[in-house]
């Protein structure tokens, strides 16, 4: 799969699993994304896809790298709707 395609799939999954935050943007906890069976089947390297999407300014999250367990409560926010 190419990066553009994986980022578009990630957007769909954030919309599916997330909810609107106080700013009206869709967000989801990293732990919810990471532990979702459908996401696990779609993304071979979820963290890599998240980093690519952040570089493209499609999403944002605190920090540079998200790790399972440690960052489960970090919000992944979709910047475009």
From Swiss-Prot:
Pfam families: Costars. InterPro entries: Costars, Costars_dom, Costars_sf. It comes from the Eukaryota. SMART domains: Costars. GO terms for biological process: regulation of actin filament-based process. Belongs to the costars family. This is Costars family protein ABRACL. It comes from Danio rerio (Zebrafish).
